[in-house]
Amino acid sequence: MIEPSIIPVLVENTEEKTFKFQPGQVSQWLTGQGLQHQILEPDLLGVELIGVEPSELQKIAEALKSNGFDYLQCQGGYDEGPGGRLVSFYHLIKLGTIADHYLTPNTLPPNSILKEVRLKVFLLRDGNLSVPSLYSIFRGSDWQERETFDMFGISYEGHPHPKRLLMPEDWKGYPLRKDYIQPDFYEMQVAY
């Protein structure tokens, strides 16, 4: 069960009649470290979402890893739709805390929960679709970043194997983008 004290709270700005989320624990910690980020609405499970500029991604990922978020559970991408942005997302977990609990039972408080945070990098569809690779920080991002490149066209600077993972090398376009047009016919080029 999620502790209500760690879920960012929606507050109304009466001067501008807009709504803004109060920072969660991770966001407050990042602010204390001097790292620039954007507070986003928590997901349906109450997990804190943080918007990150591409230029800040590696610094924030390194800071979070040093703060215990040592496991990249998932990395991927999605398309917000026609005219929308492309998004590269990262789900980070404090797995070390859980591992310590299993090695030495009864070290966690009985009501402790799995600590997780989600990072999102928003990219303009017609802009620069390049994000720094997190491979040097989380080796598990290898194939996940390649799949995101293959399906959405988001390239990862500094990735050691920047090539398609699922589609043939000569494939045109990115199949999971909302503006993708399916070809009527594709003849695979066999490299003999």
UniProtKB/Swiss-Prot annotation:
Any Gene Ontology CC annotation: plasma membrane
GO molecular function, one term: NADH dehydrogenase (ubiquinone) activity
Subunit annotation: NDH is composed of at least 16 different subunits, 5 of which are encoded in the nucleus.
Main subcellular location of this protein, as a coarse class: plastid
Matches recorded under HAMAP family: NDH1_NuoC
Pfam families, sorted: Complex1_30kDa (PF00329)
EC number: 7.1.1.-
Described purpose of this protein according to its UniProt entry: NDH-1 shuttles electrons from NADH, via FMN and iron-sulfur (Fe-S) centers, to quinones in the respiratory chain. Couples the redox reaction to proton translocation (for every two electrons transferred, four hydrogen ions are translocated across the cytoplasmic membrane), and thus conserves the redox energy in a proton gradient.
Catalysed reactions, semicolon-separated: a quinone + NADH + H(+) = a quinol + NAD(+)
Gene, per the UniProt record: ndhJ
Name of this protein: NAD(P)H-quinone oxidoreductase subunit J, organellar chromatophore
PROSITE patterns per the UniProt record, alphabetical: COMPLEX1_30K
Covalent S-S links between cysteines: none
Protein family (similarity comment): Belongs to the complex I 30 kDa subunit family.
Enzymatic class: translocase
Membrane topology qualifier: Peripheral membrane protein
Gene3D superfamilies per the UniProt record, alphabetical: NADH:ubiquinone oxidoreductase, 30kDa subunit
Keyword field: Membrane, NAD, NADP, Organellar chromatophore, Plastid, Plastoquinone, Quinone, Thylakoid, Translocase, Transport
Domain of life: Eukaryota
Location of the protein in the cell: Plastid, Organellar chromatophore thylakoid membrane
